[in-house]
């Protein structure tokens, strides 16, 4: 079994951001399982991201409006007979924090809150999730993990990668379709995940 402290050092090697000043105190903490380690890294990373501001992106919206906004969907307006109610079906883009990356983070933290981590860590993560109130949950099985990063969302790279490790390492599907949380990542699984990180 790979010691949990070594897992942190492997992650530090893969993500140079963990060597920054804000993450130094994580290196000295003692962790009972990898879920606790991942939760600590996410807690610190989310707090830093919140100081920078949550990433936003344009989300397409379609709704019946009494005033024009964006493009008019004429076919849908006729089909729903919204003109009788003096409304039009409009399609527009809304600049929102409900981005894919924020949804992945919120859903992953929800998994960690149900896992075997300390009460204080759970409390801290719940406090951070208050800032994600406008963010929806996402089914983590359907997520495309090949996220495109640019200058604006580069700070999310490490957070999304940690979320990937949590989802692939802590979720185990049972025969009835429900999921249960594993207490730790077995050695083979951890080696495979780390190899994927090195290759990416």
Predicted regions and their residues:
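Terminal, charged accessory segments of proteins
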Residues: 1-180
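Acidic-basic catalytic patches of nuclease active cores, encompassing PD-(D/E)XK
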Residues: 183-199
